[in-house]
Amino acid sequence: VLREFRKITDKPIVAVIYSHFHHDHLDGIKGLVSAEQVASGDVAIYAHSTLMHNLVDESAILGPLLGVRAGYSFGFFLKGAEVEDMNAGIGPLPTGGRPGSFIAPSHEVDDYLKVTIAGVELEIFHVPSEAPDELAVWLPNSKILIDTEVLQGPTFPNMHTLRGTKFRDPVRWVDSIDLLRGLNAHYLVPTHGQPVYGEENAEEVLRMTRDGIQYVHDQTVRHMNKGLTPDELVQVVKLPPHLANYAPYLRQYYGTVKQAVRQIYVGYLGWFEGDPVALDPVPEAEKARRLVAIMGGHDKVLQLASRSLEDDDPQWAAELATYLIRIDNDDMPARHIKAEAFRQLGYASMNVNWRNWYLTSAHDLSGTLNAARDAEKMAKVFMPPDIITEIPAGVSIRSWSTRLKSEDTLAVDSSLAFEFSDLD
């Protein structure tokens, strides 16, 4: 990136703005500036006041799991024809798999900051949307709006990521877009996707995106109040033609309406759908055993799953095979059927995240994925040394409790204290 900048300017970098805490928006900082430059004040790094909390909270608590799930989402473990001519839905495929660098911000932004950097007047807005600490940058003198990921580029917004995240509030997202619409930008610059030129075009893209988000939210809530469950909601809530056909910005390349609907339900109500049968269900393996027996036994269900593949019904084939795998996780005939079903679903999917999850899971089922190696590799991506060193000692120690094997310590009653001589 710096090499490309140097083709058009040799001016020094005096400031960096972290748009939000996601790794694709802050990893690699040491390729641009050094920690010594920041410490000396030669370079300023701006970020929202909650960025460090969000970054540490994610890395310290769920870093290992989120690293693996990110690998599935972005297709880091796929090779050859599986990724040939593919992108990430919001831009080129990330290189992935290597620990990034990080420098803690030196300047914090709350709701709004007006600042002049190197003679350029900037206004920085807090615009919670795809991330709770999202910042957008407005250059009033040139009418340029860097909206970061409030607008994710040419795709329906990823209102919930399959990687896993806390609730992304669609109401706040809409409010953030409306705030940016009020600036009447002539140039709209997302951090994913192509820039939008012209005030009318910028307004149209922002308006249609916020309308898409609000429509999905409002209709989901409307039908929730009628008593519909998530499985029922995804069959009912769909974008109307004037939004669904707004290509490419509301095409479901990266986010999908279905996963947005499910996260809205869980965000408002949690996991319980109102049927007490779900309060203490029969364990999955036992339920599978009973259902397979009712359906005629293992061989019969395997035959039905295989026939479903032949009949171009890969989803049903995968669901049938799943019952057999829950009974015996090493049932390779069932695993191969489910893997083939996932390949068919993956290659047919327009959404890149769904595609990558299907194809990567097919490798897992077939035994061609080195889960332990890849988990370790991706954990280092989500928890690189630069971030680990920024985790406060108290937070780090607190996170250790989630690693405790409680079954091995039920008879232990002791206290453990740590004293850090090198901390204030």
What would you call each of these model-derived segments?
Residues 286-287, 300, 304-319, 323-330, ...:
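Feature captures hydrophobic
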Residues 5, 20, 45, 109, ...:
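Divalent metal-coordination and catalytic microenvironments
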Residues 2-45, 108:
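Active-site metal-binding motif and surrounding structural segment of the metallo-beta-lactamase
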Residues 1-16, 58-62, 66-68, 312-314, ...:
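Pre-active-site segment of Zn-dependent metallo-hydrolases
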Residues 13-22, 46-48, 145-148, 187-192:
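Active-site neighborhood of phospho(di)ester-bond hydrolases with catalytic His/Asp-centered motifs
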Residues 1, 53-226:
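Metallo-beta-lactamase
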Residues 202-203, 207-208, 216-334, 340-341, ...:
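Hard-cation-handling environments
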